[in-house]
């Protein structure tokens, strides 16, 4: 009823690109339009090596009317990405000879290495009673290298309950299965690589062939991971003999907070911007519907159809007095996907106003035109076997 597993996996990804422009080509090279006319050559290489290790202790036990199922584990995720790019500058010294060595001036070279490491501990436990009532709890704690050294750790839980009424009440024969469920969870997203760690930027041929090293112009701050708190309720019903028609409906509510922005600050600090959390919060509400059917099922052939429908909208749950948009359509409860533009001025009779240049006068203020999120998303799949 208990077993130990060790899993290890990795992916090696490599991408090599070569760009050639012969002398006289009218195209924009890395150094400008003139590079194309004088000939141009570029080589770039990108390689990525993500690796993941996981140690899992799994257990499953039946105790009379009760069942216990779960796992405890830990994982190590490590990724390293290397980018190398080189290109000629101001043309090719020998037309038709495509090589970095053929650069008229010192070639432009760019190299970058990014690494990230995430250590995790996690566990999940599912308790069942009479194959009808279920309680599931999950906890996970991550330590990410992209977060501040004094606040690398973050925890996110999950709790779910479900009941199968078809096991305890009498239903028509054409409803063989019915399930109700609800869940609550918190998920967090760490930062991108080097969002906080500053490193010198090296530039070539800045002044008479001299190279320069400049410190980043953004200020490191204590930034918390972006957090989503979600609750969901749903039901699943199967119809007809053999469960040939299935309907699943769910409603979800997802609150997002600890959002981050890059905020401009006074250059007197020695920097131009600062990565920071803001107080603005959003809530996304939506409905998802899934319908699975088997219209045809004979001994040697079956046809399965799956239809998925979803609709959701995101609203402001809280505004930040300093950073939230200042307009008439931004308020708590308003949608966040507003689309606006500056239209044209009209007189009281509805006629367009013509300015002194003979053109329609552009309004100084933006107007709300509509919203960008789709009203409905859907997908249809057919499987023949």
Regions found by a protein language model. Give the residues of each.
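Short Pro/Gly-enriched beta-strand edge/turn motifs at strand-loop
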Residues: 361-365
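Extracellular/periplasmic, surface-exposed regions of secreted and cell-surface proteins
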Residues: 1-21, 33-335, 340, 368, ...
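Short, Lys/Arg-rich amphipathic segments at extreme N-termini
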Residues: 23-25
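Solvent-exposed beta-strand/coil patches in large extracellular/periplasmic or lumenal scaffold regions
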Residues: 220-222, 349-350, 354-359, 371
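Core alpha/beta catalytic barrel or barrel-like domain that forms the active/cofactor pocket
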Residues: 27-28, 136
């Amino acid at each position: 009823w208990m077993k130990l597993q060790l899993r290890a996996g990795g992916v090696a990804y490599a991408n090599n690109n070569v760009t050639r422009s012969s002398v006289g080509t009218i195209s924009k090279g890395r150094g400008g339009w003139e590079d194309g006319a004088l000939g141009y050559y570029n080589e770039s290489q990108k390689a990525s090596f993500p690796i993941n290790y996981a140690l899992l202790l799994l257990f499953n036990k039946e105790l009379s009317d009760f069942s216990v199922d779960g796992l405890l584990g830990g994982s190590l995720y490590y990724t390293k990405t290397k980018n190398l790019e080189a290109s000629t500058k101001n043309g090719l010294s020998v037309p038709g000879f495509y090589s970095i060595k053929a650069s008229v001036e010192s070639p432009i070279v760019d190299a970058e290495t990014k690494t990230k490491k995430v250590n995790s501990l996690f566990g999940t436990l599912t308790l069942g009673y009479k194959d009808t009532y279920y309680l599931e709890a999950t906890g996970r704690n991550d330590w990410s290298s992209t977060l501040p050294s004094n606040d690398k750790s973050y925890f996110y839980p999950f709790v779910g309950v479900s009941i199968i009424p078809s096991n305890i009440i009498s239903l028509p024969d054409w409803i063989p299965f019915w399930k109700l469920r609800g869940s609550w969870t918190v998920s967090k997203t760490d930062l991108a690589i080097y969002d906080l760690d500053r490193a010198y930027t090296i530039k070539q041929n800045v002044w008479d062939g001299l190279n320069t090293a400049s410190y980043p112009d953004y200020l490191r701050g204590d930034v918390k991971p972006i957090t989503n708190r979600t609750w969901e309720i749903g039901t699943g019903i199967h119809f007809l003999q053999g469960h040939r028609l299935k309907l699943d409906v769910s409603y979800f509510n997802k609150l997002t907070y600890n959002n981050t922005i890059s905020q401009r600050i006074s250059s007197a600090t020695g920097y131009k911007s600062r990565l920071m959390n803001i107080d603005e919060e959003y809530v996304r509400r939506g409905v998802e519907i899934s319908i699975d059917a088997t219209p045809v099922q004979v001994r040697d052939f079956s046809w399965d159809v799956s239809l998925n429908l979803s609709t959701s909208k995101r609203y402001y749950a809280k505004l930040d007095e300093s950073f939230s948009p200042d307009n008439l359509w931004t308020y708590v409860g308003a949608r966040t996907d507003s689309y606006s533009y500056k239209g044209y001025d009209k007189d009281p009779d509805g006629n367009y106003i013509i300015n002194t240049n003979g053109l329609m006068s552009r309004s100084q203020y933006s107007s709300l035109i509509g919203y960008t999120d789709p009203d409905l998303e859907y997908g249809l799949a057919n499987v023949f076997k």
